[in-house]
A protein has these predicted regions:
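A residue-level marker of the well-folded mature domains of exported/periplasmic proteins
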Residues: 2-7, 13, 25-161
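Hydrophobic core
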Residues: 13-21
Length: 161
């Protein structure tokens, strides 16, 4: 059972580089249970998206989990619809690259209603600019966290190259 949960957490961590799972959000899986991770991504076929897909696919194969992709083009309606689609498809967790903080309220609520774990990659909810959305995420047992690049430092470094 613990091995299957470790696989679920590991694929989410690999895909989104998530460091931890809250203790209250741990679900056990029996041996032989299939785990499916949904990936809501802007595009799985462009240069960056295809490389992300390759990494996620390799991690999924190594961990013996299934992956389902929905390309949402960073269109708000498609981002929120992708979460609904992945939940309806029976995903155990979703890794999302959303385009705006406002989309995360709906995504979190959908995941809570379906008891599906959710994490962000390449994005993070702004505590300063979106305090209500940030608090919704903090209060959710299904929101696992986010990993993103340090855009300020990256910009500074690029300017100084």
């Amino acid at each position: 059972m613990k091995k299957r949960m470790k696989k679920l957490v590991a694929i989410a961590a690999t895909a989104a580089m998530v460091a931890s799972v809250p203790a209250s959000a741990v679900t056990t899986y029996a041996a032989g249970d299939d785990i499916t991770i949904g990936v809501s991504i802007w595009s799985s076929t462009d240069v960056l998206g295809s490389q992300c897909k390759k990494i996620i696919d390799k991690a999924a194969a190594a961990l013996d989990v299934n992956v389902m992709y929905v390309d949402q083009g960073h269109v708000s309606e498609q981002v929120t619809a992708s979460v609904e689609q992945l939940c309806a498809a029976g995903c155990d967790g979703i890794v999302i690259c959303n385009s705006a903080d406002s989309e995360m309220t709906s995504a979190i609520q959908t995941c809570e209603a379906n008891q599906v774990y959710l994490t962000q990659f390449f994005r993070i909810i702004s505590e300063e600019n979106s305090p209500e959305v940030y608090q919704t995420a903090c209060n959710s047992p299904y929101y696992l966290g986010a990993v993103h690049e340090d855009e300020v430092t990256n910009g500074y470094t690029l300017v100084n190259l």
